Amino acid sequence: MQVKYYESVFKLDTLPLDAIHVIDNWYPKDNWVQFNNALKVTNRWSFDNDVTYEDGETTEITWIMRLFRKWMKPAGNYVEFARPVIEQMCNDFGIEFEQFDFAGINGQTQGLQGTIHKDSFRPRNITFLWHCNTEWDNNWGGKFRVYQKDTLDKGHRGFSEELVENYQIAEIEYKPNRLIIVDGSYPHSADAPNNKSGYAFRKTFVARGNVAKLVDK
């Protein structure tokens, strides 16, 4: 699947998605700063974000701040600072969720390697992934990876160099205020910060739904 890079927003014109869309400098700077100021004082992180397969094996546990559950049900009274982010995602790209499934912030430090998983099995799904950190060094790692659609069906799980070499179809660097729009039925993973990153905390704001439609906004 092709990766397309942009410097400004645009209206999506096809579902299922026919490309991985990457928008740099996405969120307005003042809003981005306001969001991160609110995030810093919202102490709702939990260390129980896992990837567990059908046979019960768990291959990933990372930090997570849960924000909205299915049908945009708030996870608590602390989440409203994040609602405008989701609204802007939908408005900027002409999307309406007919079935919204989840929003939250994934967090990784050194050693918390993301492992291969899918977000959806439905054709008209959308996953938004916003790199919400305000600072990130190019040498810290943290790449987002996408794999061939049938990789999990072939029994692959976890993360390995073999997986990257034989099944990876896209690799996108972590960059502050970068937004990725991807078909969540493609397996994907996120690298942890590497050993050059010190105490860096790699954060990704995730909003996804199993069923979306294009609207003219």
Set out the residue ranges of the language-model regions.
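Non-heme Fe(II)/2-oxoglutarate
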Residues: Q2-E96
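Catalytic core of non-heme Fe(II) oxygenases with the double-stranded beta-helix
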Residues: E87-K217
